[in-house]
Amino acid sequence: PGTGLGVCLVDGKSDHSRVFATEGGHVDFSPANQEQFELLRFLNRIYGRVSIERMLCGKGIVNIYHFLSERYHHAFDPEITAAEISALAQKEGDSLAKQTLTWFMRIYGAFAGNLALTTLPFGGLYLAGGITPKLLDELKQGEFMQAFLYKGRMSRLLLNVPVYAISDTKVGLQGAAMYGYKQLQLATA
């Protein structure tokens, strides 16, 4: 997650890795509990259809914070940013901001677990984007992995999927540049 939510699949078994782009960030948000259904209803009133990207991007952190602000009768500043919410949680210990990041991690983990069940990436599931490196401490706190593994009878299968956090925020851009370079080589060969 970053400004949006991108999803791709990589087949790295051959000599030349193949990348399959998707629009996976635009699948429907799938609430995991009653509280998340309330979040879905809240965002449905604002946006109509609610994709998972409405939660898992910078604006998504703000959306969750907005919902929790209304739920707990706190004033909501419509100008607040995801970075400010993260700072409130990480540096100032603000309980609403901390709860926002907990919700974000649970939703992120559940979505990643759904992707893992769909694609079975036994070589690893890689988390990238602008937000992931900024929330490494939150990733380590367990909410993400707990939600990732909360898949009923399929939970044991997901124990075989390693999850990696990529700290380089430019990895997507570097991959696109590499792809472009390879395409140029093929065109001139």
Task: Label every model-predicted segment.
Residues P1-G4, I131-P133:
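Short glycine-rich anion-binding loops that position phosphate/pyrophosphate groups of nucleotides
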Residues G4-D11:
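Short beta-strand scaffold segments in enzyme catalytic cores
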Residues L9, Q34, E38-A189:
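ATP-binding/phosphotransfer module of carbohydrate and carboxylate kinases, centering on a glycine-rich
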Residues S14-H26:
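A short alpha->loop->secondary-structure connector
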Residues E23-E35:
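An acidic intrinsically disordered interaction segment
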